[in-house]
């Protein structure tokens, strides 16, 4: 009986660990990175996550490196004359100490154009977030299919 309970416990713990996809380095946490695509053959997708700066220093997000699509960019959405406009970011994004930067719809997000292949729901895709001062955080985006709204 003890062996069965132990096996169930280990199975539960290992599954929880395998489904979690949060990343941390040098007091910077990356929470739940996902790429939303409408269908497997989509050519465009958006990436969302939270970046939490738990350090006592400012950090700047410079770029994203990935072999996911032909082009990947950091974008922001601004409201101009009652119209939302999306545009690529040309500079680094500052994250102050003890602050969180959330990549979400109608805000900062990653855009992926011309994916290198078709994806499956829940597929994990490797990438690297590049910050100033040489900080690089390897992450994995989880592919989320469908038209439903993003919920973190």
Question: Where on the chain are the PLM-derived regions?
Answer:
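Bacterial N-terminal signal peptides
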Residues: 7-15
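Positively charged n-region of N-terminal signal peptides that target proteins for export
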Residues: 1-4
């Amino acid at each position: 009986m003890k062996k069965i309970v132990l096996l169930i416990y280990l199975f539960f713990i290992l599954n929880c660990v395998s489904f979690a996809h949060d990343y941390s380095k040098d007091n910077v946490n990356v929470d739940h990175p996902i790429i939303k695509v409408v269908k497997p053959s989509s050519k465009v997708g958006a990436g969302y996550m939270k970046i939490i700066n738990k350090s006592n220093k400012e950090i700047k997000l410079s770029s994203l490196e990935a072999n996911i699509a032909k082009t990947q960019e950091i974008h922001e959405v601004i409201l101009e004359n009652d119209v939302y406009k999306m545009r690529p970011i040309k500079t680094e994004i500052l994250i102050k100490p003890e602050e969180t930067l959330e990549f979400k719809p109608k805000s900062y997000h990653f855009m992926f154009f011309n994916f290198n292949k078709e994806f499956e729901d829940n597929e994990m895709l490797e990438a690297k977030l590049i910050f100033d001062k040489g900080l690089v955080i390897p992450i994995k985006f989880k592919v989320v299919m469908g038209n439903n709204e993003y919920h973190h």
